[in-house]
Amino acid sequence: MKIEQTLSIIKPNIISNNFIGNIINRLEQAKLYIIASKMIKLSWKEAVSFYIEHKNKSFFSDLINFMISHPIIVQILEGENAIKRNREIMGNTNPKIALAGTLRSDFSNDIIKNGVHGSDSEESADREIKFFFKKDRIFSRI
């Protein structure tokens, strides 16, 4: 199996509902190790820059307004097939159709306020990790 790193974001609704520990516990139980983590409040400019690929989609402004509404936790997860495994743990982007037992099914009920974000490919993970973390702030387990 391949050891990978992926970006994970715990979104504002999880923070405001005090479910942070629940999310981290599930990730740790899945043997996804947190190798960098910080709580931040995104500016409008940062949120637009991070989600630029969605700029022409109908939900873009709702997503940006949500992501700047409260702090978020950004973290780097490391483990075997971390990208795929994190996405499986998160569940479908739409919590209403996410499988029971996934993070989105258990902790959210709205497609915009869906609780968590995870990189969807190695390229995305690399870009997203660099967006939030300097190399000297990442402490790999390998």
UniProtKB/Swiss-Prot annotation:
Specify where it is mainly localized.
cytoplasm
Q: What is this enzyme's EC?
A: 2.7.4.6
Any one Pfam family match given in the protein's UniProt record, by short name: NDK
The highest taxon in the source lineage is Bacteria
The molecular function terms of the Gene Ontology recorded here are: ATP binding; metal ion binding; nucleoside diphosphate kinase activity
Q: Where in the cell is it found?
A: Cytoplasm
The chemistry this enzyme catalyses reads: a 2'-deoxyribonucleoside 5'-diphosphate + ATP = a 2'-deoxyribonucleoside 5'-triphosphate + ADP; a ribonucleoside 5'-diphosphate + ATP = a ribonucleoside 5'-triphosphate + ADP
Alphabetically, which GO biological process terms does the record hold?
A: CTP biosynthetic process; GTP biosynthetic process; UTP biosynthetic process
Give TM segment ranges.
none
User: Which InterPro entries does this UniProt record tie to the protein?
Assistant: NDK-like_dom, NDK-like_dom_sf, Nucleoside_diP_kinase, Nucleoside_diP_kinase_AS
Q: Which UniProt keywords apply?
A: ATP-binding, Cytoplasm, Kinase, Magnesium, Metal-binding, Nucleotide metabolism, Nucleotide-binding, Phosphoprotein, Transferase
- List the SUPFAM superfamilies hit by this protein, alphabetically: Nucleoside diphosphate kinase, NDK
Top enzyme category: transferase
Main function: Major role in the synthesis of nucleoside triphosphates other than ATP. The ATP gamma phosphate is transferred to the NDP beta phosphate via a ping-pong mechanism, using a phosphorylated active-site intermediate.
Protein's name in the database: Nucleoside diphosphate kinase
Its gene is: ndk
